[in-house]
Amino acid sequence: MLRLRLRSIVIGAAIAGSILLLFNHGSIEGMEDLTEISMLEDYTPEAANKDYVGQQEEEELLYDQPSYIEEEEDPDLEAYLSDLEREELEHSLEELDEENNYKLHLRYSFSQLQDFDEENEAVHMIVPKDTYEFEVPYHADIPKLIWQTSKDPFDREVMKYTRFWRINHPSYSHAVLDDEQSKALVISSFGDSSVSKISQAYAMMPLPVLKADFFRYLVLLAKGGIYSDIDTAPLKHINNWIPREYRKRNIRLIVGIEADPDRPDWNDYYARRVQFCQWTIAAAPGHPILWELVRRITDETWKLHDSKKLSKNGESVMEWTGPGIWTDAIMDYLNWQYGPFSVENITNLEEPYLVGDVLILPITAFSPGVGHMGSKSPNDPMAYVQHFFAGSWKDD
């Protein structure tokens, strides 16, 4: 009898526990349902889209950090700027006049082209060797380095141009290298000519202009930064080269159109139908376009060497190291990586055009004032660099 009573108690407890468990489970599910209903009552398509866009922006920021700090968008800008950068941003290179028309404004303008002390300028131009001996991998930003070359960096005719890059960009490292310094940088970056085909190709080139062309690609490949010919001067600060809408994108190569001769006889005057200029280039170190370009130039140099055709023939410069092969390397990469891509994509270009991590600037950017092919005045807001064409490479 006692055994039956105990059995009944156990069975009753089990049934009660099961009922309690089912009740609790149902209550939890009910709470979830109520939560979902309350969320649906607050739901609007605008709110959902805002949340999604906000999430997208947060994810993009994790991978697309801005290459350049933008003063207007960062309330804590002062916390990140060095004294030199702060000084730079306090002196705008552009402004509007009283009639709201654009006018050129430099901290140091071209009216002061001959007004400088040579000894003082020479002191500022001396660049310690260790400022350009460091390695930066591809996928880095374009570093704050400005590269220029000259047989005599301290010649007054050279300094009257190069100083504008240094004075207007005090937070950048600025190097004007002579032939021996350029050679040393190539060897330190790519190895001695006894073991490096690249360095040996550089050493074998018979014309100074060939070496000058090749060096700009090599230094940008190895170190990155901005290369500009010694007879150029900035019309805008380098930060202004990238439009506001692209400043949070990872831009790793900036090129400008040199020529856009939309006419049947274009090949009588230019190497390519649309041609990119080489007198000013900005790049992150290790960019694939630069690697491919260096490979092509190295292969061509060795091919000419092996066939005993290395000569001082300036007619081959356009195709050997000049704008022809430079343009081909860019166009081939963009077509292969983001294609189809052809000259039709950039003919009569009037605004900066971003393709992947390559920013293509219209002809006015680096070729203002040429008077044709859509090039506008050096006073135009899109004019970034003035090229004075003072070089005489054909006489070398």
UniProtKB/Swiss-Prot annotation:
Regions that span the bilayer: 8-28
Plastid recorded as keyword: no
Enzyme nomenclature, EC number: 2.4.1.232
GO cellular component: endoplasmic reticulum membrane; Golgi apparatus; mannan polymerase complex; mannan polymerase II complex
Pfam families reported for this sequence: Gly_transf_sug
SUPFAM superfamilies in the record: Nucleotide-diphospho-sugar transferases
Gene3D superfamilies: 3.90.550.20
Localization terms from the record: Endoplasmic reticulum membrane; Golgi apparatus membrane
Lumenal side: 29-396
A GO MF term: glycolipid 1,6-alpha-mannosyltransferase activity
Co-factor requirement: Mn(2+)
Keywords: Endoplasmic reticulum, Glycoprotein, Glycosyltransferase, Golgi apparatus, Membrane, Signal-anchor, Transferase, Transmembrane, Transmembrane helix
Glycosylation sites: N345
GO annotation terms (biological process): cell wall mannoprotein biosynthetic process; glycoprotein biosynthetic process; protein N-linked glycosylation; protein N-linked glycosylation via asparagine
Location (main, coarse): endoplasmic reticulum
UniProt short sequence motif DXD motif, positions renumbered to this chain: 229-231
Family stated for the protein in its record: Belongs to the glycosyltransferase 32 family.
Cited PANTHER family: INITIATION-SPECIFIC ALPHA-1,6-MANNOSYLTRANSFERASE
Record-given protein name: Initiation-specific alpha-1,6-mannosyltransferase
